[in-house]
Amino acid sequence: MAKELKFSEDARRALERGVDTLANAVKVTLGPKGRNVVLEKSFGAPTITNDGVSIAREIELENHYENMGAQTVKEVATKTNDVAGDGTTTATVLAQAIFKEGLKNVAAGANPMILKRGIEKAVQKLVEEIKELSKPVEGKEAVSQVAAISAGNDEEVGKLIAEAMEKVGQDGVISVEESKSMGTSLDVVEGMQFDRGYLSPYMVTDTDAMEASLEDPYILITDKKISNIQEILPLLEKVAQSGKPLLIIAEDVEGEALATLVVNKIRGTFNCVAVKAPGFGDRRKAMLEDIAILTGGQVITEDLGLKLENADISMLGRAHKVTVTKEDTTIVEGAGDSKEIQNRIKQIRTQIENTDSDFDREKLQERLAKLAGGVAVIKVGAATETELKEKKHRIEDALSATRAAVEEGLVAGGGTTLIDAIPALDELNLEGDEATGVDIVRKALEAPVRLIADNAGYEGSVIVEKVKSEDKGIGFDAYNGEFVNMIESGIVDPAKVTRSALQNAASAAAMLLTTECLVADKEEDNDSNGNAGMPGGGMPGGMGGMM
């Protein structure tokens, strides 16, 4: 396909128009008095959101050149969201500010490659300063504040997330699901839970709740299919003599083996529950190993040269309690060695850091949570489907932001930290266009505070100058229209969010500034592609002549 090209100033101006289109759509949502954006859906109700990345993802421009600029800034929002879970609007605003300020200097003759170097050095210095300004998150109250702000000043959501994090710990899994009721609630599952239930309803111990509860049971863990009772008979006899119940986790238990276990349960001779092993393939082996480490048992597998017939009672795991329902099995207080469990957790953490696949990362995170803490489910309820989607989205954002805060600490919110970090740039002794690059960043750092004030109906430039003249940590509370100590007032941002927004914005803006040529597909002109080579009626006329 033929290509069209644009060069130098033309190219950069086209990119600027694209950046502005996307950034202006996202900008309206910034701050406590920011507005919402309504996104049309191909089917169903439209989505109403104030989440920067959701808006950015919907934007695709008709003009190829402008679209390149818009897509580059969209990536800034997406990357910030992936890393920190929030701060997407701030990142977009910073990218636009750095790019526009940089364009003026490039047009005035500055070398974009040297400017880029100056911008990078400025950002490096600012990241160090943000680290210095951050304060660790301590206590449930602080966690609750961060979550509430990220969820659009919703204190109820803040409390729920703080409670969930307190119960399952930093490594626990907190998932957000839709509730069938109007209210929003929290369910916590302690211990290790996996999604496999009993193989026969005759195994239940509580017929009302249809669940089996085993107190202080032995746990047999194997990746084999058990169909012949003779394979496990010696083991069953030893467990029966101990008077303890037994949980069997195997690839499957079927035929004669299952029938024998059920008959013994009904007669009251021996209490045993069988469940299928969780997961599939290599993931199943890893999960069985997790269960073995948690309960202090061994996986009886032929990979290790172990056979069921030769298994000893010392190879079985133990737990304080096991509850099995039709769908789930929960192991509470496994008897595994805490040192072994910690080593396993470290190993899974390393795998999480090294994996490139989002799916694998999610599954590893689940395994980590099951070993380290537990699982909490926030069930979101609302009056209408549109409100439900919006609320669920807000809670997911708040959850990511809260995790980021626990990880790297908190800084003053409302763009205040970016202005507080400006004096640190004076320590950089650079010259020429590198110094200009630093000045570009210095000016761009004012953009978030200016915009928050503008969106709340105040004069942005006046507010920026006032924040600059105040002590560090004093910022503008746009909701109440007053200058306050941001951290004491609970207006805070996770340091990771502020850092990621700045790094991603500067990276994209600097790349756009160094652009000298744009190449895009040439738009097809429908008129020129018509029947130019074959005038209308030419062929029938010719045919008539031949006849």
Swiss-Prot record:
Location of the protein in the cell: Cytoplasm
Catalysed reactions, as listed in the record: ATP + H2O + a folded polypeptide = ADP + phosphate + an unfolded polypeptide
Spans annotated as Disordered: 523-547
One family name in Pfam for this protein: Cpn60_TCP1
Biased composition (Gly residues): 533-547
GO terms under cellular component: cytoplasm
UniProt GO BP: protein refolding
PROSITE patterns (UniProt xref): CHAPERONINS_CPN60 (PS00296)
Source organism, top-level taxon: Bacteria
Gene Ontology molecular functions: ATP binding; ATP-dependent protein folding chaperone; isomerase activity; unfolded protein binding
EC number: 5.6.1.7
Keywords: ATP-binding, Chaperone, Cytoplasm, Isomerase, Nucleotide-binding
Residues at which ATP binds: T29, L30, G31, P32, D86, G87, T88, T89, T90, G414, D493
Location, primary (coarse class): cytoplasm
Family: Belongs to the chaperonin (HSP60) family.
Subunit structure: Forms a cylinder of 14 subunits composed of two heptameric rings stacked back-to-back. Interacts with the co-chaperonin GroES.
Database matches in PANTHER family: 60 KDA HEAT SHOCK PROTEIN, MITOCHONDRIAL
Function: Together with its co-chaperonin GroES, plays an essential role in assisting protein folding. The GroEL-GroES system forms a nano-cage that allows encapsulation of the non-native substrate proteins and provides a physical environment optimized to promote and accelerate protein folding.
Protein name: Chaperonin GroEL
Organism: Halothermothrix orenii (strain H 168 / OCM 544 / DSM 9562)
Gene label: groEL
